[in-house]
Design a protein with these regions (language model features):
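N-terminal transmembrane-helix/juxtamembrane module of multi-pass inner/ER membrane proteins
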Residues: 2-74, 112, 217
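Alpha-helical transmembrane segments of integral membrane proteins
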Residues: 19-27, 90-98, 163-166, 184
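Alpha-helical transmembrane segments of multipass membrane proteins
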Residues: 27-35, 39, 102-107, 192-197
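Aromatic-anchored segments of alpha-helical transmembrane domains
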Residues: 32-33, 100-106, 168-179
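Membrane-interface loops
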Residues: 42-53, 83-161, 168, 205-218
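Internal transmembrane alpha-helix with an interfacial aromatic "cap," most often the third helix
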Residues: 70-87
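Membrane-interfacial alpha-helical segments at the cytosolic side of multi-pass membrane proteins
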Residues: 75-80, 145-164, 190-200
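Interfacial helix-loop-helix junctions of multi-pass membrane proteins
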Residues: 138-140, 170-196
């Protein structure tokens, strides 16, 4: 605990880092709040339903509870593991906000209908955010998979990072059984998460913010 406290005290002493933390928190809050009316509009828009041959080999099954526990347990543990590294945590916030924006862009450009046989994903937290309305058209790409992969990228090398990678795979498979995403949604999600992180790191270098030699997994 003293190590975490010391890291944050030293981090907060530097004005640029302090301002960046506040900026990242504000941007993330604005993006998340903006996603609520955005997804409400997406739900009312017609889209194209894709044929996904992978579903021929995967029986539909409700895995809402497992998906819920994997995601939020991973997020909670991820934040705990990143607390000793404030700068890494801030970079994670920035990358997450950017990939949410990228999701909004791709959903706007690629209107899709949910897969046949979709089993509504029960998520009390998201349900609260979206005022109890079921969101089914947040397609291309999978936010759950991208979140898990971004967490994997942010964690330092070690057993927990390896477990996070396993979590990415399990999450993707569960979403396909749930029929809430097409296979392509799941496959491309890690690329968007990685791209968001690389863009954030490049922007930081461009404006003169260092990342203490940050390399994913180190």
């Amino acid at each position: 605990m003293s190590r975490i406290k010391g890291s944050w005290i030293n981090f907060w002493k530097i004005p640029d880092q302090r301002y960046e933390f506040i900026f990242a928190a504000v941007i993330l809050t604005v993006v998340m709040l903006s996603s609520v009316p955005f997804l409400t509009q997406i739900e009312m828009r017609p889209g194209v339903q894709l044929h996904d041959p992978v579903f021929n080999y995967l029986p539909a099954h409700d895995l809402s509870d497992l998906i819920f526990y994997i995601l939020y347990t991973a997020l909670l543990l991820g934040v705990i593991f990143l607390l000793p590294s404030p700068e890494r945590l801030v970079i994670g916030f920035e990358a997450y906000a950017l990939f949410v924006v990228l999701r909004m862009i791709t959903m706007t450009l690629v209107p899709l209908e949910p897969p046949n046989g979709l089993i509504p994903l029960v998520d009390p937290i998201l349900s609260f955010m979206y005022t109890g309305k079921q969101v089914n058209k947040d397609l291309f790409f999978s936010g759950h998979t991208a979140t898990m992969y971004l967490l994997y990228l942010m964690l330092p090398a070690g057993i927990y990072r390896k477990l996070a990678f396993v979590g990415v795979i399990v999450m993707g498979i569960c979403l396909l059984f749930q029929r809430v995403h097409y296979t392509v949604d799941v496959i491309v999600a890690p690329f968007f998460a990685y791209g968001a992180l690389r863009i954030v790191l490049r922007l930081r270098r461009t404006i003169g913010l260092k990342a203490s030699g940050f390399v994913a997994g180190e």
